[in-house]
Amino acid sequence: MSSKPLSTRTVGRGSAVSPDVRLRKRRLEDGQVRLDCANSLSVYDEWETPHAIVSDGAYGILGFEGDTADHMGIPAWYEEHVAAWSRRATGATTLWFWNSEIGWAAAHPILEKYGWRYVSANVWNKGKAHIAGNVNTATIRRFPVVTEMCVQYAFAPKLGGLDLKHWLHHEWKRTGLPFRLANEACGLKDAATRKYLNPGHLWYFPPAETFAKLAAYANQHGDPTGRPYFSADGVHPMTADQWAGMRSRFHCPMGVTNVWDRAPLAGGERVKMPHLTGGKAIHLNQKPLDLMTRIIEASTLPGEVVWEPFGGLFSASLAAKQAGRKAYAAENVPLYFKMGAERFGFQPG
């Protein structure tokens, strides 16, 4: 039996319509957005390097055909995708991993295995409206669940097979210079040795300008036979801009915490086909554009690239386009692809 993810069709949880639909075009693009009707595993290598990846795939709740029945199958479902993300990610890449609490817990070891460093867990609190009329408190054996997780990870790059803090320490050691001279190089009292060249838990990521000073001093005064120092390619020392690109971005908006009080998606933003669904939503897991915009603007700059591997109705990609970013997304259910693409003004069918 293949371990590859199957087609992502809604089954068993009130699917509103049959997902069968014919498409004239299975790839749509406009210079800012590219949408593929395909398994994302088949197109990752064609996409530009991501600055952010927004994952909203299997939850382990039989949400679609190919989803697992419970959280036990989550690691196997995601592993091939996570491995592909890691091959294309850089130190500047942020992953936003949407899931249930138990789904995220099951996936976390796989994310760590492939180099994703946990940053923070954000909770979407949908409020009591999410369960209104759907909970019998006389029989339920737990508190009603009204939350969903959106967990932030940063890709942890390696240089010379070492993580960044050990690589910095190793490179200075190679120079043959006393570590105390690193403080002189940076114009600091002791922060270079205490923080930037510390391979332990006190390590801090050096600002780009500080890194450039370290590299310049090392290459000017260090053992000539070991040059270049602080080089990623073995030819030239890294520049300040190259070093800055070894860390993911984050811009925290004022007043926002890791608990997002936001009612369930409803109204005009919820995609429906009244003649087919009788008023039901097309996609059970459609995310609000405002939450997608929040995470994209926090972790990318205009013009940077966002991936949406499990597109659904392409909410992350639409938010990315509206925020002036580039988006690459895949969805292999033709109906979802068609309905999502129409949100951009494309006509795929």
Give the predicted meaning of each segment.
Residues M1, P348-G349:
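Short intrinsically disordered terminal tails
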Residues G340-A341:
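Conserved SAM-binding loop
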Residues M1-R13, V21-A329, V333-F337:
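Core catalytic lobe of class I
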Residues Y336, G345-P348:
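Conserved phosphoryl-transfer catalytic core
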